């Protein structure tokens, strides 16, 4: 059984590693060109087997439908400095020829009830195996550093309380999500100040 899981997950691991390399290379290309990169850093993971099994049970996913019905077995996360960078990255990914966007969820304009904000893409990505090509679904989450900090804390609390966060804590989390987003908006305003031409530049 362990070998079965290893063989099943190996292409997903390959997909995550390839995408991390490509996105980090893209970040480097921005910097070499003298432009500010909308990508701050990139992480990725393959969902642990216990988490896959738990989600299969919760969503009643049959083993033979696992690749089709579970979209986040492979996950890549892109962190950005500013909210505007998130939408720049989304556009970059939409235009790429090595993947196809099949689903988008904008939790920034429409946050989850908990306060969670992020932009989710589900893409199909081709992995070249020894004798064939395999199309895999990969979930790409794009968020700011502030959104990621909040989501990390919320995830830890969900784990601690086994998915049942006390109402008082949930209310404070929701409030802190608004504070984090206000910080993002303020940082965007500051970004506009230092990227806009100064009065001295306009006179030249």
Regions found by a protein language model. Give the residues of each.
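Long beta-strand-rich cores associated with HINT superfamily self-processing modules
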Residues: 67, 80-187
């Amino acid at each position: 059984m362990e070998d079965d899981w290893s063989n099943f997950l190996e292409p997903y691991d390959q997909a995550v590693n390839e995408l991390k390399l490509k996105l980090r290379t893209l970040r480097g290309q921005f910097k070499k060109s003298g432009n500010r990169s909308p990508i701050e850093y990139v992480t990725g993971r393959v969902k642990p087997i216990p988490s896959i099994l738990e989600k299969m049970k919760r969503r009643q996913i049959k083993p033979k439908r696992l690749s089709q019905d579970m979209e986040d077995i492979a996950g890549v996360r892109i962190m950005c400095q500013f909210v505007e960078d998130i939408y720049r990255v989304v556009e970059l990914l939409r235009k790429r020829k090595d993947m196809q966007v099949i689903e988008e969820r904008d939790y920034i304009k429409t946050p989850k009830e908990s306060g969670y904000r992020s932009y989710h893409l589900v893409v199909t990505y081709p992995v070249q195996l020894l004798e064939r090509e395999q199309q895999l679904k990969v979930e790409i989450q794009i968020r700011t550093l502030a959104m990621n900090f909040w989501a990390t804390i919320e995830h830890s609390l969900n784990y601690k309380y086994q998915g049942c966060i006390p109402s008082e804590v949930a209310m404070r989390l929701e409030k802190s999500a608004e504070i984090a987003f206000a910080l993002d908006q303020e940082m965007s305003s500051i970004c506009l100040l230092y990227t806009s031409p100064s009065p001295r530049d306009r006179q030249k």
